From Swiss-Prot:
InterPro entries: Rbsml_uL15_N, Ribosomal_uL15, Ribosomal_uL15/eL18, Ribosomal_uL15/eL18_sf, Ribosomal_uL15_CS. Part of the 50S ribosomal subunit. One of its GO terms (biological process) is translation. SUPFAM superfamilies: Ribosomal proteins L15p and L18e. It comes from Methanococcus maripaludis (strain C5 / ATCC BAA-1333). The lineage of its organism: Archaea, Methanobacteriati, Methanobacteriota, Methanomada group, Methanococci. Binds to the 23S rRNA. This is Large ribosomal subunit protein uL15.
């Protein structure tokens, strides 16, 4: 087992114990403050050299009224919903009529597979959803 003596034991008798002048070991005065203190005053040149992007704002936040946030559902999930609650939907010409807004969705997305022919009504459709609905023998109606 290695027996290592502590630094302070080695430094006994050296008056300042490795801290140079005695007053350099008091507080944070020797290093110009703790942490980022003085970065807009006496340490400004080091900020300019090593961290020039520390201060200032960059980019922007869009106004929330400009961001369109629609409730979405994938076409595969919609078919699962239809199969689960068959009695809640009307059938016209062999196609199930689904109004997505009545079940709380505004946009239909194209993830998943469908085999049921359906007429889907929604505010918006993705291109993939349109293709899959038509491929299954259904149609889409944008409100």
């Amino acid at each position: 087992m290695i027996r290592k003596s502590k630094k302070i034991t080695k430094m006994r008798g050296s008056r300042t114990c490795g801290y140079g002048e005695a007053k350099k070991h008091r507080g944070a005065g020797h290093r110009g403050g703790r942490g980022n203190a003085g970065h807009q005053k006496h340490k400004w040149l080091s900020v300019c050299k090593f961290n020039p992007d520390y201060f200032g704002k960059y980019g922007f936040n869009r106004n929330p009224c400009l961001i369109k946030q629609l409730e979405t559902i994938n076409i595969g999930e919609l078919e699962e919903y239809i199969l689960k609650y068959k009695d809640a939907f009307q059938v016209e010409d062999g196609k199930v009529v689904v109004d997505a807004t009545t079940i709380g969705y505004e946009k239909v997305l194209g993830k998943g597979r469908i085999s049921t022919a359906m007429v889907v009504k929604a505010v918006e459709f993705s291109e993939g959803a349109k293709e899959k609905i038509e491929a299954a023998g259904g149609e889409f109606v944008e409100l």
